[in-house]
Structure formats: structure tokens, C-alpha cells
A protein has these predicted regions:
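Glycine-rich dinucleotide-binding loop and its adjacent helix/turn
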Residues: 131-149, 207-227, 250-314, 437-453
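A conserved FAD-binding loop/helix module that cradles the flavin
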Residues: 304-307, 314, 463-494
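Glycine-rich Rossmann-fold phosphate-binding loop(s) that bind the pyrophosphate
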Residues: 159-162, 299-301, 462
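Ferredoxin-type iron-sulfur electron-transfer modules in oxidoreductases and energy-metabolism complexes
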Residues: 25-38, 64-65, 69-104, 108, ...
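Beta1-alpha1 glycine-rich phosphate/pyrophosphate-binding loop at the start
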Residues: 5-32, 41-44, 68-82, 89-92, ...
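Feature captures the FAD/FMN-dependent oxidoreductase FAD-binding
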Residues: 149, 154-158, 206-255, 370-385, ...
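FAD-site-proximal beta/loop scaffold in flavoenzymes
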Residues: 261-292, 391-467
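C-terminal catalytic lobe of FAD-dependent flavoproteins
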Residues: 13-37, 42-45, 365-367, 373-374, ...
Length: 495
């Protein structure tokens, strides 16, 4: 512990975010990092607890507490404080394949479990992580490190999201010959087309992919395995196959008028915007536009917030975000004690921007759509909303949200974006390989394992565990790499 009194001497300081009315003028990342001197003070705030909950990654009441990757947080916090950036990077890379991604998009369960947060502000772990990886790129330490020895084993990874990339990275480090197949035109999966550019600039993904290419990983794009690329061919040519296709089957809503023109899944809205942005800076018009439209976003999660921020950048006339559940409290309640994930109200960047542009929070709680109304041509013109209340089911005893009769109200709507989560993987890939699915439509495996019912076929990420965080996907990718390595070699020395 470099500075035992650091948490007493220094307050938490965050990097500055551009003002909402400025940052909505483009799709660029908008956070300015701290100076090196400021960052070192933040590293000094780490208490190096006897039991560092920040790296625990344990499930508590259905939510993760601490980092699922078990990052060596106290160690690299102390190294940041002492200015040993190279050593900090080496400690960080021991557990995290992609700190350049997690330091931008992770909700930081490590900080929620930080002991400093018991009586004050937690250590700025996420910003320290960001500083470490960016410094490593500046100094060249994050550059290519090809394996010194190669095996004769060939592995196909289907999907280039965080889980597939993590598996490929680890297996390549072991010396295996890895080919990643991606159905889209660009590598990155969820990272590329599911997360807006202002949260994760796509050049950051390309930077890492280029490093992986130089280290020996092969990438094949526009390879839609199960459709234009035969599963049988892969099973014949490769010693092992890893299915990491994500949970890309969006949850729909059953509402009268759902077939109206102007209702889309959030993932299609976000993907089309990013693709057009990268191809033409939105000049080709090949995207779902929210310009001058009254937008309704159904869903209160991160994807819903991304839709709000994206619609505002398009120049929407208004934006409303519907949340079925009640508004969360400002502070932890007695039944949500530390180190559980704090179930408290958070105003994210998209909501901040809506407040700045329209003068009010876009979120309406305990509300859903009762009906969509379309004109004679089939175009959406308005939505009928209805309030919800919590009610206990007399048969099951479970609480659920039910409509409040007589609470209906009409609102104008030209564009509706459904951000209601995902049901699981699209089944055609699993069908092509003959792997079994479980009741949740995820690929079935034994508990804690990654092997499917088909010989030499493994699975990981959201396709395996269901919709989750990027950090969980990386965790799964690293774990499946160990299982594949042991399957091929009889043992594994992967961490």
C-alpha cells in the first residue's frame, strides 16, 4: 500500500465530460481524461483492503458485486500511484483481455463494491483502468506480442463480439491457429454495431483488432455461418469450434398496431446509424432517421438510453423513454446494502442530453404502450400509453405490473424503438451445428462448463449465459479458451 492515508487526503475526481449541448453535435466520445498527476492521486485513494470486494465478482441477489474478471484492482491502483505504468499494464492484462473496451462501456461493478464507497465516494477504478491501457498504447507496450511457438491445432471462433474476441486472443496466445468468422462487414459484433460511437469509438476496436491480426489471428467478415458459410465445412477443417454469436434475438412486444410503419427494434436503429456513420458520416441516408420525429423508446436500460442519445443527435422533435418499473430511490435502501449492486436512480448521458435539449427527463415510469395508432397508409401517428401498478398475483404470490384502467393518454409518435432486451441467440447457428438449446434458448452445457452436446463444439458469452455485460462476455471467452485448450492438448496453462 503506497499511501495508507490516500483515501483520507484525496477526494474522488472524475474526468470531465463535454457539456450536453456541445457533445450532441457529433458522435464522438466526449470524456476528457485526468492528467497523470491527477490520476496518480486517484490511485493513492485505494485502501488495499484485506478483503478486496472490488475484485470478487460474486452474485448477490441476482446482481454481480465486484469484477467478474477478478481484476487485480488494488495492485494496479497502487502501481498507478507510484507511476509504474508498465507494471500496472502487466497486472491488468493478466485478467482482462480488453481494458480498452471495459474502461469505456462497463458499468463498473468494481466501484459499486469498493470499500471507500461505504462512507464516501469509491475509488475511480474505471478511470484508472482507462489511463493504464491508453498509456500502454502510447508507450507501445500494448503492441503486438505474437506467440513464440505454434501448435498444429486449428480453431474456428464464430462471432467477433467481446466473448469471441477474448477466446480468440487467449487461444492465439497459447499458440493455436485461430480464425474468427463474423457475419457483419466489420469485426466487433456487439462492440461495433450494438454500442454507439459516442460510448465506444470504433477506431478503438480497430486498433485492437489490428494488434490481434499482427499477433496471428485471422478474421473473416461477411461469413454468416449457418447460411452462406457451411457448419459442416468448419467441423471438417478445424480441430475445435467456439460458438460466440451473442444473444441477438430481440424481445418483441404484443401490442395492437405493432405492424405500423415506424416501429423498429433498438438494435436495428443503432446498427444502421453506426454503419452509415462509418461508411459516409451519415451522408448516404442508409439509416433509420429520427430527425424531426416524435420518438418513443420502450425500455429503461442502457440500450434505451443509447437510443435516446442517438435520436437527439439525429435532431428528433421530442423523445420519451418508457419504463415499466417504478422510479428507483436516490440512495440505497436498507434491503440493498453494500457491497450489493446499488439499485439507485442513475441519469445516464442520453437522459442528461434530453434534459438539456427539451428541459425535462425523458423517462416516464410505470408506463407502457396500450396501442399504436396508424393512419390510412399504415404509418404510425400516435401511441396510447397506460399507467401500471404493482399487484400481487393471488395464485403465485408474485408481484407484477398491471395496467391501471382509465389512465390512458395519447401522445404523438412517428418513431418507436423497442429496447426490451433479448431472448437469446438466433437459432439458425445452433441448428447448423446440431447443438442443443435450453429452456431460455441459450446453448445448453453442463453447469460451469462450455462444451456442447456436439463433439469439439464449445460455446461462450451471451449465446451461453444470456444477455449480460461486456465484462461477463470477456470472462466467458477466457474460460472457454481454457476448456478448448485442455480438450486439444490434455492440459492448459492459460490464466
Amino acid at each position: 500500500m503506497g499511501k495508507p492515508t490516500g483515501f483520507l487526503e484525496y477526494d474522488r475526481v472524475n474526468g470531465k465530460a463535454a457539456a450536453p449541448l456541445e457533445r450532441i453535435k457529433n458522435f464522438n466520445e466526449f470524456h476528457t481524461p485526468l492528467t497523470e498527476a491527477q490520476q496518480r492521486k486517484q490511485g493513492a485513494r485505494c485502501m488495499e483492503c484485506g478483503v478486496p470486494f472490488c475484485q470478487s465478482g460474486m452474485m448477490m441477489n441476482g446482481m454481480v458485486s465486484g469484477c467478474p474478471l477478478h481484476n487485480l484492482v488494488p495492485e494496479w491502483n497502487d502501481l498507478v500511484y507510484t507511476g509504474n505504468w508498465g507494471q500496472a499494464y502487466n497486472r491488468l492484462k493478466k485478467t482482462n483481455s480488453f481494458p480498452e473496451f471495459t474502461s469505456r462501456v462497463c458499468p463498473a461493478p468494481c466501484e459499486a463494491a469498493c470499500t471507500c464507497g461505504l462512507n464516501g465516494d469509491p475509488v475511480s477504478i474505471k478511470e484508472n483502468e482507462h489511463a493504464i491501457i491508453e498509456k500502454a498504447y502510447e508507450t507501445g507496450e500494448a503492441g503486438p506480442r505474437p506467440p513464440k511457438l505454434r501448435t498444429d491445432k486449428k480453431i474456428a471462433v464464430i462471432g467477433s463480439g467481446p466473448s469471441g474476441l477474448a477466446a480468440a486472443d487467449q487461444l492465439n496466445k497459447r499458440g493455436h491457429n485461430v480464425t474468427v468468422f463474423e457475419r457483419e462487414d466489420r469485426v466487433g459484433g456487439l462492440l461495433m454495431y450494438g454500442i454507439p460511437n459516442m460510448k465506444l469509438e470504433k477506431q478503438i476496436i480497430d486498433r485492437k483488432i489490428n494488434v490481434m491480426k499482427e499477433e496471428g489471428v485471422t478474421f473473416v467478415t461477411s461469413a454468416n455461418v449457418g447460411k452462406n458459410y457451411k457448419a459442416a465445412k468448419l467441423l471438417k477443417e478445424f480441430d475445435s469450434v467456439v460458438l460466440a454469436c451473442g444473444a441477438s434475438n430481440p424481445r418483441d412486444i404484443n401490442v395492437p398496431g405493432r405492424d405500423a410503419e415506424g416501429i423498429y427494434f433498438a438494435v436495428d436503429f443503432l446498427k444502421s446509424t453506426t454503419k452509415s456513420l462509418l461508411n459516409s458520416n451519415l451522408e448516404d441516408g442508409n439509416y433509420i432517421s429520427a430527425k424531426d420525429k416524435h420518438v418513443i423508446v420502450i425500455g429503461g436500460g442502457d440500450t434505451g438510453n443509447d437510443c435516446v442519445g442517438t435520436a437527439i443527435r439525429h435532431g428528433c422533435a421530442s423523445v420519451t423513454q418508457l419504463e415499466m418499473m417504478p422510479k428507483l430511490p436516490e440512495k440505497r435502501t436498507e434491503n440493498n446494502s453494500w457491497p450489493e449492486w446499488p439499485r439507485v436512480l442513475k441519469t445516464d448521458y442520453g437522459q442528461e442530453e434530453a434534459i438539456a435539449v427539451f428541459g425535462h427527463d425523458p423517462r416516464i415510469y410505470q408506463t407502457t404502450v396500450k396501442e399504436f395508432v396508424k393512419d390510412e397508409s399504415g404509418k404510425l401517428v400516435k401511441a396510447i400509453l397506460i399507467s401500471l401498478k404493482a399487484e400481487k398475483n393471488p395464485e403465485t404470490g408474485r408481484m407484477s405490473m398491471v395496467p391501471v384502467e382509465g389512465s390512458e393518454k395519447e401522445v404523438p409518435a412517428d418513431l418507436v424503438l423497442i429496447a426490451a432486451g433479448f431472448l437469446g441467440a438466433q437459432s439458425y447457428v445452433a441448428d447448423a451445428f446440431g447443438v442443443e438449446l435450453n429452456a431460455r434458448t441459450n446453448v445448453a452445457t453442463e453447469a460451469g462448463k462450455y462444451a456442447t452436446n456436439v463433439e469439439k463444439v464449445f460455446t461462450a458469452g451471451d449465446m451461453h449465459r444470456g444477455q449480460s455485460l461486456v465484462v461477463w462476455a470477456i470472462h466467458e471467452g477466457r474460460n472457454v479458451a481454457k476448456e478448448v485448450d485442455k480438450y486439444l492438448m490434455g492440459y492448459t496453462n492459460l490464466a
